[in-house]
From Swiss-Prot:
Substrates-to-products reaction catalysed: L-methionine(out) + ATP + H2O = L-methionine(in) + ADP + phosphate + H(+); D-methionine(out) + ATP + H2O = D-methionine(in) + ADP + phosphate + H(+)
Family: Belongs to the ABC transporter superfamily. Methionine importer (TC 3.A.1.24) family.
Main function: Part of the ABC transporter complex MetNIQ involved in methionine import. Responsible for energy coupling to the transport system.
Keywords linked to the UniProt accession: Amino-acid transport, ATP-binding, Cell inner membrane, Cell membrane, Membrane, Nucleotide-binding, Translocase, Transport
ABC transporter domain ranges (all copies): 2-241
Uppermost EC category: translocase
Name under which the protein is recorded: Methionine import ATP-binding protein MetN 2
Tree of life domain: Bacteria
Location of the protein in the cell: Cell inner membrane
């Protein structure tokens, strides 16, 4: 549905040349939710703006539903954009228009009949759960309600594609979850293809089918969400994943932790489980097989792309050689083991 091929974008600022995107290729299959994650300044917003030609690429090809947008005239591009909805971090609603009026605006600009506008707006109000707010003005809406209006407006022309530019960044966690559930529901019910950019792995984890990691204008990793969470190939992907599951070392442990093994101190382990290793009784097997004890301090588990993953902090008690053998056993069964120190 969306195919970006060898996209580069270079900006000129006086005598400076800034490369925002460098040879980026990306394919978003029809009906999927595809996330692009990266830190601030990585090129995410430039990438998504190239997808509907709000930014014209310096080089490369932009295909949406088989049509190359880079070859179109302004008039042709305007018509093609009717198939591409877009929502932003800041909702960009017209303060002088009601909820109904904001959603109706694209249809009015397209010279749709008043009867058809009313029918379509009412459908969208029902879809986004705002049937009781049609006469309200943006100033009287919460952030989540404003974003729901923006989503409805973006869907007014029945687009095949929805672009989401940091659509939940300005929202609190509970509202973020509700907006993500709405996007997932719209994707499922309408078969809408969604390309979203974010700096939060939680967003990717909750609704995306595939994910790409962008850094300094380049895509450094891309795969299904389950594969990236199970087997991240780059340090940046690992960093984003760890941000979703983070266990702090208890303060009293941190104060007495030593970087080197000492008498009467035991290893403090961080164990990361993904895929099948989450369900397997590996801890109890290691305890029995190697005559060790494992004291669990804290643990956390979650899902991403249909795959479970988790993290655990634990003390390892027993003979040093038995402990090393137990660690190797866990690693051989796809558990990532890190010795944080000795306590």
């Amino acid at each position: 549905m969306i195919k970006l091929t060898h996209i580069s974008k270079v900006f000129q600022q006086g005598s400076r040349t800034i490369t925002a995107l460098s040879d980026v290729s990306l394919h978003v299959p029809a009906g999927q939710i595809y996330g692009v994650i990266g830190a601030s300044g990585a090129g995410k917003s430039t990438l998504i703006r190239c997808a509907n030609m709000l930014e014209r690429p310096t080089s490369g090809q932009v295909l949406v539903d088989g049509q190359d947008l880079t070859t179109l005239s302004e008039g042709q591009l305007t018509r093609a954009r009717r198939q591409i909805g877009m929502i932003f971090q800041h909702f960009n609603l017209l303060s002088s228009r009601t909820v109904y009026g904001n959603i109706a605006l694209p249809l009015e600009l397209d010279n749709t009949s008043r009867a058809d506008i009313k029918k379509r707006v009412n459908e969208l109000l029902d879809l986004v759960g705002l049937t009781d707010k049609q006469d309200a003005y943006p100033a009287n809406l919460s952030g989540g309600q404003k974003q729901r209006v923006a989503i409805a407006r973006a869907l007014a022309s029945n687009p095949k594609v929805l672009l989401c530019d940091e659509a939940t960044s300005a929202l609190d966690p509970a509202t973020t979850r509700s907006i993500l559930e709405l996007l997932k529901d719209i994707n499922r019910r309408l078969g809408l293809t969604i390309l979203l950019i974010t700096h939060e792995m939680d967003v990717v984890k909750r609704i995306c089918d595939q994910v790409a990691v962008i850094s300094e204008g380049k895509l450094i990793e891309k795969d299904s969400v389950s594969e990236v969470f199970s087997h991240p190939k780059t340090p940046l992907a690992q960093q984003f994943i760890q941000s979703t599951l983070h266990l702090d070392i208890p303060e009293d442990y941190a104060k007495r932790m030593s970087p080197e093994p000492t008498v009467d101190h035991v290893p403090l382990l961080k164990l990361e489980f993904t895929g099948k290793s989450v369900d397997a009784p590996l801890i109890s097997q290691a305890v029995r097989r190697f005559n060790i004890d494992i004291g669990i301090l804290s643990s956390q588990m979650d899902y991403a792309g249909g795959v479970k993953f988790g993290v655990m902090l634990a003390e390892l008690h027993g003979d040093v050689q038995d402990g090393l053998a137990a660690i190797k056993f866990l690693q051989d069964h796809h558990v990532k083991v890190e010795v944080l120190g000795y306590v």
